[in-house]
Amino acid sequence: MNTVNETGPHKGRYLFTVFETGQSGVQRIDLLTGETETIWQGPAPGSHVAFDASYWTPWGSFITAEESWTTAAAGATSPYGRLFELKNPTTARGITLPLTASSNHDADFAHQTVVPRVSHEGIQFDQQGSMYFIDELNGGNVYKFTSAAKWGEIMSGRANYFDAGQTFVLRVGSGSVPNATGTFTWVPFTDANGVGLNGALTITDVNGVSSVDGRNTTNLAAFKGTDYQRPEDLQLQTVAGRQYLYMATTTTNEVYRIDLQRNLITVFADRATIDLATGAAAGAALSSPDNLAIDHDGNIYIIEDRNGGVDDDIWFARDLNMDGDLADAGEGLARWASNGTTGSEFTGLYFDPTDKRRAWVNIQHPASGNDRTIEITIR
């Protein structure tokens, strides 16, 4: 995925993306000079894997996380499922190859162990400072982390957001019905310091690092979260001061809308949604929604995970009255872009927050082996 430095000195100058590989890393593109640098990379194959999220925090750091975790009733011991914070993303010097023991020494890059282990993808922060994340799994859940630190102290640099905090899982009803919609509650499974509540699964991984196991804890009856089918990306939208969280689920071909004020989850888009090009239901034309994006006007975009050489599209969701459904006259889905690169998929569509006429998208794992970051401009 992609993000720019949304705050601080040189705001909007740098574009960041990550390597979703078996030796993950973080790349920075200087949009002023065109220089591209890797500013952090896993020191060895398998040490850090499947970085997916790219998110600029409100206090000016960069976070990413691993899309890799294990289902195990007693708790997993995988070294992965971690969330990392790069605290000096604009000033860390680019590394040179070959990698050595000192290659990453200029990057202040930390595993934030207070965040439970899951297979991470989408990450978003609301206006109150809560962080939302998912577990990318058939049967995965939606989570909220709330820092114990005061927001003003975090923003001024006097406190660390990830020093302590509480994590919750979203539950509709008893949590027993998968893909449920309706009123939900946030069920805590750690205390305010991030320590697992009684019965939660705290694991020590093969590297000797301890964390709460988010996935396997929220499969337990006491902490059961509502299961969704491969929840992937998240996107926050603000309408008239109210905050809504959108979530794509790849297996069920749906996008959900989570009303954070009313604690209500509904379906925003699915295969029954009108394709504005035909006037009929989108049907199988909408498949495997993966990433989400939002433009300056608050419109939601849905990015598919399909075969780029055949049928991989980005859909524009036309919600004229911003009421969270696409059922009103003139509303529906329209293809905004189509991929044409064999073996690839679109990923990481991101609209420049400083220029409403510019966006970026990645072409990931093409058959040629040549990944690309593409800039899209409207003039």
Roles of regions detected by a PLM:
Residues 1-379:
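Sequence/structural signature of beta-propeller domains
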